[in-house]
Amino acid sequence: MRLKHLPSEFQEALPVLEKIKAAGFEAYFVGGSVRDVLLGHPIHDVDIASSSYPEETKKIFPRTVDIGIEHGTVLVLENGHDYEVTTFRTEDLYVDYRRPSQVSFVRSLEEDLKRRDFTINAFALDEKANIIDKFNGLVDLEQKILRAVGNAAERFNEDALRIMRGLRFAAQLNFDIEKKTFIAMREHAPLLEKISVERSFIEFDKLLRAPYWRKGINCLIASQAYDYLPLLQSTADKWQQLLTDLPEDFTFSTSEQAWAAVLLYLNVENPRSFLKSWKTSNDFQKTVEKLLAIYRLREDRQIKKTDVYQYSATLLTLVEELRQAQGLAVDFEHIKELDEALTIHDKHEIVVKGGDLMAAFDLKPGPDLGKILNQIESFIVAGNLANERQAILDFVRKEID
């Protein structure tokens, strides 16, 4: 098969392929970018595979960076872009179900493509826009099937993260997982306990944010992979409830919204501890906790202006979206009106600072000054005090007197 048109991202990288070939080696575009162009999706990173060994690649290009030379990868800086050029390679036994014990460089493209995870990721594209398809990936792409390259059991035994990648691809592409591939995923799911939590989170997060996340969750349940992920043991019924409650066409707007929904349906008592187990950042944990706090607040009452100031219209809107998906009462317009009525959205916007008050009224740092600053903030947020220097100073003068 040949592409009618080579996308600009590949055209910009053509000089790299041409220089490698001019030096007597083979070079191809490989990986997700080739799959994405075949699907008509936006192209992200353009990766190149070559028969040139790392030291040979470095001799071809004046500007390179060693970023993974032990695995055959050299970063080539060309025409204002940087491209990862990786030597064709085979991999020995995997020591920890994630990394090969040894990488061997080879001159054969087919040997290199054999080690890929799924047939739809095992394409190569040459400089003339010809697609090299050694494993019938084009057929699988057309039939929307996710199939492991070669022996599925071997692929997942080599790298158990491929199980999560498979679930994620099903969710992103709306592909069905081929029967033998799925059986191997289910049989090898216990190996997910060997995988770093951070890597599992990245894949799971992409699954939740995907347009067909429901398919991903259904596959997660059917494969029983959840039993081998942090704090998700025996949660099939709760995942099923999430699928039942949220409509078919609902998609999550942000990762934080998605994980807040997950924690809500899993009835997690300590969200911070749960998210720490998934090795998420402090900022991520705080945002999810805020979303859950807003959700609980909304169970009791409507949103007030102070809520918009405390949590932000953005987070309040995310919770309203989730409530709307659940068929609960929502008021997006009310949040918008309250947000527009706020004269400040952060205390740093207050024109008078603590130092100004200390100078104007001979105040000392301490609890009393903090109390006055909090009063100023509360009055401005409530709309009872203008955020103007003179108005604030007059207010403080009255409070002190």
Swiss-Prot record:
More details: A single active site specifically recognizes both ATP and CTP and is responsible for their addition.
Catalysis performed (reactions): a tRNA precursor + 2 CTP + ATP = a tRNA with a 3' CCA end + 3 diphosphate; a tRNA with a 3' CCA end + 2 CTP + ATP = a tRNA with a 3' CCACCA end + 3 diphosphate
Stated name of the protein: CCA-adding enzyme
Residues at which Mg(2+) binds: D45, D47
Protein family according to the UniProt entry: Belongs to the tRNA nucleotidyltransferase/poly(A) polymerase family. Bacterial CCA-adding enzyme type 3 subfamily.
UniProt-listed InterPro entries: Bact_CCA-adding_enz_type3_sf (IPR050264), CCA-adding_enz_C (IPR032810), CCA-adding_enz_firmicutes (IPR023068), NT_sf (IPR043519), PolA_pol_head_dom (IPR002646), PolyA_RNA-bd (IPR032828)
GO molecular function: ATP binding; CCA tRNA nucleotidyltransferase activity; magnesium ion binding; tRNA binding
Binding site for ATP: G32, R35, R116, D159, R162, R165, R168
Keywords recorded for this protein, A-Z: ATP-binding, Magnesium, Metal-binding, Nucleotide-binding, Nucleotidyltransferase, RNA repair, RNA-binding, Transferase, tRNA processing
Gene Ontology biological process terms, A to Z: RNA repair; tRNA 3'-terminal CCA addition
Annotated NCBIfam families: PRK13299.1
Residues binding CTP, per UniProt: G32, R35, R116, D159, R162, R165, R168
Domain of life: Bacteria
